[in-house]
Structure formats: C-alpha cells, structure tokens
Amino acid sequence: MASTQCFLHHQYAITTPTRTLSQRQVVTTKPNHIVCKAQKQDDVVDAVVSRRLALSVLIGAAAVGSKVSPADAAYGEAANVFGKAKTNTDYLPYNGDGFKLLVPAKWNPSKEREFPGQVLRYEDNFDATSNVSVLVQTTDKKSITDYGSPEEFLSKVDYLLGKQAFFGQTDSEGGFDTNAVAVANILESSAPVIGGKQYYNISVLTRTADGDEGGKHQLITATVKDGKLYICKAQAGDKRWFKGARKFVEDTASSFSVA
C-alpha cells in the first residue's frame, strides 16, 4: 500500500509543472514522508516476523531436544509428579509358608476358617462373598495328576464348592434337578506347567435355589509339592463378577504359586 501511494503522488507532481516551487516542495515532501512511514511499518513487520521465526526455532529445538518425563501422563492417567517408577497399588504381595500370591489391596484378612487345612482368607471390604482362601493339606500324592483329571480332582475336593444344606423333597425353579437346591458347572479347566511344577486350574459356576448373587464364580488353582496339597480358591458373586470383581479374582488366582 505504501509504494502505491508514493507512485500516485509522484505522477501528480510531474503533470503540474506550473505550480510554484513551494507547492512542489510540499508535494515532494509528502511522498517522502509517506515512504518514511511505509519503511517504518515494514521494519515493524520484519521485526515481528523475525521474532516469530526465532521463537519457532526455539520451540522446535526444545521439542527435538526434550525427552518424555516420568511425570508425563496420558489422558485419564495419574501423573507421577516425582518422576519415580509407578508400582501396581491394586494388589499386595503375600508370602506364606511354601506359597505366594497377590491379594487385592482393598480386601481385608479374615479369621474365618471354612475348610480343613485353611491357612489364609482375605475378603472384600464391602462383600464377603468376594474372597480368597488358601489350603495346605498333607497328601501321599507325588503330583497333582495323581488325583486324575482336573474334573476328577474337583470331585475329591467338592467341599470347596459348598455342601448342600437342604435335603428333602423339593422341585426348585431355575433348572435344578428334583430334590436339588444347588448345582455346580465346570466352565473351564487346564493343566499348565509353571516353574517345572504341574498345576490344575478349574473355573466353576455354582448356583443355589435361593438365587443369592445369581451364583458364584469360583477359580481353583491346585498343585502338589513335598507331600503337601496346595489349593487356592478365589471367588466372587455373579453380579459383582460382571461389575469389576472378575479382574481381581482372576488376577489373584493366576498369581498363586508354590515357593
């Protein structure tokens, strides 16, 4: 814009030569003044652009030279402001006599003993149906496979699933057999070898006629070592199982191992 204005003023001065010297001086003074302003504006623009370029270079250099800080956190995660390695606070390690496992941090120890040889029980603060128990019993078996298949082993320790308390004439709704008020279904079983030791993993869904919790999901992990049968049973009610308890029960059961 500044150069265009100067061109118009110069043309006007040339086409009016009959004006006085003072008038020509005035005319020639204005374009000079305009040019001067235009130069100042250009200088300001150049200075602003230069500063922006310099700032961009600094930001780019900082981005290239920076490293991801331990305090950085993705969306939805808590920032580790002190820069130390984060640990899993959802579980607490438990080292027992000959075994170890991870216990949900919000579960409390319980003195209740349901089964023979039970040495540990932790339960959910808000729902005792969600719990984990560890049993240690003497045995003449050398390996867990000496009990037969996982299903055969379960039949020998079916007390873990809870005995039917009612015996009499009844026809319960919900698909139960005549005179039966409880049923257990094996959902899955496996026989992994961990650390050179054979284990049995059995997932069972038990239901009772009273419909309490819609049934219980019970995960049983067992192995034999040095003349002892080690059993870990973690469970949760069916409703809470699908509301988040499943993760804690599965993680606890899978963490169990003999030392």
Swiss-Prot record:
Stimuli inducing this protein: By light.
Listed GO biological process terms: photosynthesis
Gene3D superfamilies: Mog1/PsbP, alpha/beta/alpha sandwich
Transit peptide: 1-73
UniProt entry keywords in alphabetical sequence: Chloroplast, Membrane, Photosynthesis, Photosystem II, Plastid, Thylakoid, Transit peptide
Highest taxon in the source lineage: Eukaryota
GO cellular component terms given for this protein: chloroplast thylakoid membrane; extrinsic component of membrane; photosystem II oxygen evolving complex
Keyword Acetylation belongs to the record: no
Transmembrane segments: none
Location of the protein in the cell: Plastid, Chloroplast thylakoid membrane
Matches recorded under InterPro entries: Mog1/PsbP_a/b/a-sand (IPR016123), PsbP_C (IPR002683)
Role summary: May be involved in the regulation of photosystem II.
UniProt record similarity statement: Belongs to the PsbP family.
Protein name: Oxygen-evolving enhancer protein 2, chloroplastic
Species whose genome carries this gene: Pisum sativum (Garden pea)
GN (gene name): PSBP
